[in-house]
């Protein structure tokens, strides 16, 4: 990847030549900086081009600690890439922005930006001013969004089949694609359970918790309406509680410690016995107060200061038939409270019956020799949350399955935000190229030339899809162009059959928001890079 460009300061060179020649002499510098920025950003785009589409390749990423990640998710690849050049870093940020906005299309957005930068290079070499290129690209973008919106067809959230097709298309390019028949319905069900389809305008993905558990295969993934915890039940005798009353405490059930570092000197056995009796009475009192509220399942937040649960407290809780789960992570507390309707308690005096959540069943489930999970189901409170349990034979598979499910959830979220679909398989990009070329003929001068270059750049997506699928990119794109010129708007590359077909009939669809967001963000980034004419290193 190109190194940082250290700007040569022509001003100092000129000033050194004598007082009369204090003019800025290095005229070529802005052009050099611009080309350096473009080539650095293009290098990033070229690095992930091969991972586009269902037949795209995966990348194996090894970090400094030796941890390995296998993925073809554009945002994940770029996030872990060591990028030095500031312009190349802009493309990493671009992919991140697409991930936040749409959740899918993170590879496409970088490839489109790389292709647009390629077009910029050719236009700059022909002597066209960067500002003219930038303004023309903005015009082309506005027209492009119009074209994409015309191509789209509305979708209702009650149309379950369309939602499934969108999720399946997203999963097809992932490692977990062979499990799409399981993961697609799971993703659709998860989103539909946490929103009200009639009024929802977005989906808060924090309401869908993904729990990773090593062991089994991706086939063992499941959707649970309720709460799933990976922590073990501390008192092994109690593994099932019906009509559960669940308390969540943020204080420790162990002997109190002094605030300051004091020392207590015990001089005889009687005093020693008294200390132990006091400790026993103190803990028993805590446990009795918990039992008095009717609590029969107790969750204890993880404590970094000391043991959150002493053996003595566990003994008393066991006798009183209270199921105990300790080491609950702080970041999980909000989700737990929303799911089961409990409230976190920071002091024993506030532990009352109205702070408890309730559920039909709290049960520790054995996973065929690969550990245990605690499931709390039948929650009485209407907090709309669900949990997806992701299983896999090793850490790499589980992490990639989690990313795949996240992308599928994001696709459904896009359809909730903007209820419109367009065809996939490179069809929208070819249609854009064709219609923008027609539009460029209505413009005059340099603008027409720049819009035409923008249109040509759009062909990179179908070309890359064909290349990654082992087809001839030139003949495929040419045939696709002809089919679209004859009015077949939904003709796209069918990667499975290795040819061109009506992509809507093949059920390859994607949300309109993904394409519009990719086009908008890529164009904005390219315009930013184009306007930079100097890189200044500050102290």
From Swiss-Prot:
SUPFAM superfamilies: GroEL apical domain-like, GroEL equatorial domain-like, GroEL-intermediate domain like. Keywords: Acetylation, ATP-binding, Cell projection, Chaperone, Cilium, Cytoplasm, Cytoskeleton, Hydrolase, Magnesium, Metal-binding, Methylation, Nucleotide-binding, Phosphoprotein. One of its GO terms (cellular component) is chaperonin-containing T-complex. It is found in: Cytoplasm; Melanosome; Cytoplasm, Cytoskeleton, Microtubule organizing center, Centrosome; Cytoplasm, Cytoskeleton, Cilium basal body. Its main location: cytoplasm. Coiled coil: none annotated. Its EC number is 3.6.1.-. One of its GO terms (molecular function) is ATP-dependent protein folding chaperone. ATP binds at residues 53, 105-106, 174. InterPro entries: Chap_CCT_delta, Chaperone_TCP-1, Chaperonin_TCP-1_CS, Cpn60/GroEL/TCP-1, GroEL-like_apical_dom_sf, GROEL-like_equatorial_sf, TCP-1-like_intermed_sf, TCP-1_chaperonin. Pfam families: Cpn60_TCP1 (PF00118). The modification N6-acetyllysine is found at residues 21, 288, 302, 319, 326. The modification Phosphoserine is found at residues 36, 184, 202, 444. ADP binds at residues 53, 105-108, 172-174, 425, 510. GO terms for biological process: positive regulation of telomere maintenance via telomerase; protein stabilization. The modification Omega-N-methylarginine is found at residue 19. It catalyses: ATP + H2O = ADP + phosphate + H(+). Residues 1-29 are annotated as: Disordered. Mg(2+) binds at residue 104. Component of the chaperonin-containing T-complex (TRiC), a molecular chaperone complex that assists the folding of actin, tubulin and other proteins upon ATP hydrolysis. The TRiC complex mediates the folding of WRAP53/TCAB1, thereby regulating telomere maintenance. As part of the TRiC complex may play a role in the assembly of BBSome, a complex involved in ciliogenesis regulating transports vesicles to the cilia. Component of the chaperonin-containing T-complex (TRiC), a hexadecamer composed of two identical back-to-back stacked rings enclosing a protein folding chamber. Each ring is made up of eight different subunits: TCP1/CCT1, CCT2, CCT3, CCT4, CCT5, CCT6A/CCT6, CCT7, CCT8. Interacts with PACRG. Interacts with DNAAF4. Interacts with DLEC1. Belongs to the TCP-1 chaperonin family. This is T-complex protein 1 subunit delta. The gene is CCT4.
């Amino acid at each position: 990847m190109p190194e940082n460009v250290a700007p040569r300061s022509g001003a100092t060179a000129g000033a050194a030549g004598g007082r009369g020649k204090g003019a800025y002499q290095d005229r070529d510098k802005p052009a050099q900086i611009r080309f350096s920025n473009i080539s650095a950003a293009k290098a990033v785009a070229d690095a992930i081009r091969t991972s586009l589409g269902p037949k795209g390749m995966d990348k194996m990423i090894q970090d400094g600690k030796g941890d390995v990640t296998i993925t073809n998710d554009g945002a994940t690849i770029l996030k872990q890439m060591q990028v030095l050049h500031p312009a190349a870093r802009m493309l990493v940020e671009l992919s991140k922005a697409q991930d936040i906005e749409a959740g899918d299309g993170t590879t496409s957005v970088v490839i489109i930006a790389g292709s647009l930068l390629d077009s910029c290079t050719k236009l700059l070499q022909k002597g066209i001013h960067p500002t003219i290129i930038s303004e023309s690209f903005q015009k082309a973008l506005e027209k492009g969004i119009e074209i994409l919106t015309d191509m789209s067809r509305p979708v209702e959230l009650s149309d379950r089949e369309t939602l499934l097709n969108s999720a399946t298309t997203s999963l097809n390019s992932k490692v977990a694609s062979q499990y799409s028949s399981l993961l697609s319905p799971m993703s659709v069900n998860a989103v539909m359970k946490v929103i009200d389809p009639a009024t929802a305008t977005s989906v808060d993905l924090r309401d869908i918790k993904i729990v990773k558990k090593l062991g089994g295969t991706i086939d063992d993934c499941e959707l649970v309406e309720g709460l799933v915890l990976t922590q073990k039940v501390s008192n092994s005798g109690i593994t099932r509680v019906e009509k559960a009353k669940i308390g969540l405490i943020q204080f420790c059930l162990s002997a109190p410690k002094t605030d300051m570092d004091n020392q207590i000197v015990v001089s005889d056995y009687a005093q020693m016995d008294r200390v132990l009796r006091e400790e026993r009475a103190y803990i028993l009192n805590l446990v009795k107060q918990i039992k008095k509220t009717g609590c029969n399942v107790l969750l204890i937040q993880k404590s970094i200061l000391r043991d959150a649960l002493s053996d003595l407290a566990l003994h008393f809780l066991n006798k009183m038939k209270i199921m105990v789960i300790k080491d609950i992570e702080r970041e999980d507390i909000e989700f737990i409270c929303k799911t089961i309707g409990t409230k976190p308690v920071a002091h024993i005096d506030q532990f009352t019956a109205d702070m408890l959540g309730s559920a039909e069943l709290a049960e520790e489930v054995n996973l065929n020799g690969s550990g245990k999970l605690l499931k709390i189901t039948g929650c009485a409170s209407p907090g709309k949350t669900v949990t997806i349990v992701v299983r896999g034979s090793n850490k790499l598979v589980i992490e990639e399955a989690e990313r795949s499910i996240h992308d599928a959830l994001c696709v459904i979220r896009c359809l909730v935000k903007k209820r419109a679909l367009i065809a996939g398989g490179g069809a929208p990009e070819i249609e854009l190229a064709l219609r923008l070329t027609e539009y460029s003929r209505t413009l005059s001068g340099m603008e027409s030339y720049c819009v035409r270059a923008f249109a040509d750049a759009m062909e990179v997506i179908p070309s890359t899809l064909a290349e990654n699928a082992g087809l001839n990119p030139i003949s495929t794109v040419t045939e696709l162009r002809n089919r679209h010129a004859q009015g077949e708007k939904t003709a796209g590359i069918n990667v499975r059959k290795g040819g061109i077909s009506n992509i809507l009939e093949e059920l390859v669809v994607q949300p309109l928001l993904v394409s519009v967001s990719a086009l908008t963000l890529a164009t904005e980034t390219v315009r930013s890079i184009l306007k930079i004419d100097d890189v200044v290193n500050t102290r």
